[in-house]
Amino acid sequence: MMRNLKSIMRRHISLLGFLGVLSVWQVAGFLKLLPKFILPTPLEILQSFVRDREFLWYHSWATLRVALLGLVLGVLIACIMTVLMDSLGWLNDLIYPMMVVVQTIPTIAIAPILVLWLGYGILPKIVLIILTTTFPIIVSILDGFRHCDKDMLTLFSLMRANPWQILWHFKIPVSLPYFYAGLRVSVSYAFITTVVSEWLGGFEGLGVYMIQSKKLFQYDTMFAIIILVSLISLLGMKLVDISEKYVIKWKRA
């Protein structure tokens, strides 16, 4: 009996820990150990989800549209750039250092500059998402290319395969696990970057709604938005995992 109980606790230790934190959090709020503007209780946040569900749904859909569009474009650009950088050594030497420099600049610092150059429409948001999502994918795929078996590359060359045949039949399959590793990071970056870009202006989106809630002192709604963004990012990463299992079938074997 005790052994079965320990086994169950080990399997569900993350859930138990999460429920424990929520319980302590709720009790601390009930006893008013923390002011509401610092940390609303889980129950208040849940009530905000129910109360503001229509607004949350509307602004979530607006954020999702921008994030998914930017992510798709970012993935396409990253894949094309990776192939070119792998084929042309001089292009890799030219672009890679600049990409590293761009990644060291905080997103919140780049966003106002893009707004200044491109206006308050959707374009600066898309560009910002592309800037943040391409780098993890490019680095991951290039790493996958570098881990290709040299003996297999030699074999393809002896069979007189051209560079595109080597890429399609060998390099791409080998680098797919690396691609998905980078895609997981880019998915989370896409949603976070979208919310950050919405802070700077606009009429819809979770970032805009968060700023509006802050001005109205609706701190429970602010926390609800934060949790919602996190859940959307986790859902996106889970979808990537599911896609990977179906695309890379040999990995399961």
Named regions from a protein language model:
Residues 1-19, 238-253:
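Transmembrane alpha-helical segments of polytopic membrane transport and secretion proteins
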Residues 3, 31-75:
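Periplasmic/extracellular loop-to-transmembrane helix junction in inner-membrane transport proteins
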Residues 69-99, 116:
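Transmembrane-helix boundary motif in ABC transporter permease subunits
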Residues 89, 146, 223-253:
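C-terminal transmembrane helix and the adjacent membrane-cytosol boundary/short C-terminal tail
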Residues 100-136, 143-144:
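Generic hydrophobic transmembrane alpha-helix motif, especially the helices
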Residues 116, 192-229, 248-253:
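Glycine-rich helix-loop "coupling/hinge" segments at transmembrane-helix boundaries
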Residues 127, 131, 164-196, 229, ...:
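Transmembrane alpha-helices
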Residues 144-182, 206, 210:
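Short cytoplasmic-facing helical segments at TM-TM junctions of multi-pass membrane proteins
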